[in-house]
Amino acid sequence: MHKRRRLLAFATVGAVICTAGFTPSVSQAASSGDGEEKGSYAETHGLTADDVESINALNERALTLGQPGKPPKELPPSASAPSRAPSDDRETPPAEPLDRMPEAYRAYGGRATTVVNNYIRKWQQVYSHRDGKKQQMTEEQREKLSYGCVGVTWVNSGPYPTNRLAFASFDENKYKNDLKNTSPRPDETRAEFEGRIAKGSFDEGKGFKRARDVASVMNKALENAHDEGTYINNLKTELTNNNDALLREDSRSNFYSALRNTPSFKERDGGNYDPSKMKAVIYSKHFWSGQDQRGSSDKRKYGDPEAFRPDQGTGLVDMSKDRSIPRSPAKPGEGWVNFDYGWFGAQTEADADKTTWTHGDHYHAPNSDLGPMHVHESKFRKWSAGYADFDRGAYVITFIPKSWNTAPAKVEQGWP
């Protein structure tokens, strides 16, 4: 038996729980004017301080495994190395028979939820196809999936998500006007006020739309392009026709190099260096802006208004300084999760609110207090609502082979 560990002192008492009812986008929710704040990830999911510590440690372990060349994150000045080994209770879900059908999901308030084992069954029936043939999820894939939210995107995209081609939308005029024409709330510090106004100036709906528009342009450029040079020329033609500011990106930028840096593009059973065999797809990352460990402690607690803003012309977000560092606690006992990932793929549903985003709650630990991993399929408003742990939402483009079915044109939420 495991004893329940110390409880978190939650940052927001009586907060809106993001898993229930209607919730606006993460940016709009932060400045809705109704006096209510978003709940933390831990509060929403009933997690303890030890749970959050373990989740963040496992997220860092996944980053090390998935991106071995990426420098490790810096610890906050007030922090020390973990007193125990990063969570040793994660388990890889067992294999599921290829012919075993999923059970019904639990649906409520724009979200359908199931245990990870049942998601594997659905994945095998719906998303596993390679060249039209169903595949059993391999042990390596189940290992990736077991890491939780990032695991869902990881297993569907192929490599660990690099977040290099990220888009967002920030309303500079709204930000300046709100700073000038509104005042801090009672007992709100200037740093809290500026962080809240910055968060409220991001629009996830517009950021998602920008990523979809760019992915559409990329997919047009991929058609009938059998070498990278033809793809780049096609891409520049499409951008010229659309008068898109991305045309002025440097030829060495992430925008133009994204395809060649995709591992599956080079694999013989993937793209095999043929752009026409690839397609652009989308996932999302929610994270915290105040990651500069040499900067203001207030920004680490309440957000850095200047950090991770998109280019006003292209919508591109420079993610090079994203080290997946969580929000710093402002009070003893607070704990914040370092990020959340959601998988979109290549759905063709025009109405963003009807799209489905697949993500996990935490790593798979069925024999610990944390418990088994659950997989959520959320409508866009539910996904974009986010948590108080995060003040940025980026929409990222990557590539997968067309022969994979992990990003179908239509996604049915749950299982009938």
UniProtKB/Swiss-Prot annotation:
Renumbered residue ranges of the record's region Disordered: 64-103, 290-331
GO molecular function, one term: protein-glutamine gamma-glutamyltransferase activity
EC number: 2.3.2.13
Cross-referenced Gene3D superfamilies: Protein-glutamine gamma-glutamyltransferase
Residue stretch(es) of the prosequence: 30-85
Keywords tagged on the record: Acyltransferase, Signal, Transferase, Zymogen
Modification(s) after translation: Predicted to be exported by the Tat system. The position of the signal peptide cleavage has not been experimentally proven.
Low complexity composition bias: residue spans: 76-85
Biased composition (Basic and acidic residues): 86-103, 295-309
Range of residues in the leader sequence: 1-29
Family to which this protein belongs: Belongs to the bacterial TGase family.
The protein, known as: Protein-glutamine gamma-glutamyltransferase
Lineage per the UniProt record: Bacteria, Bacillati, Actinomycetota, Actinomycetes, Kitasatosporales
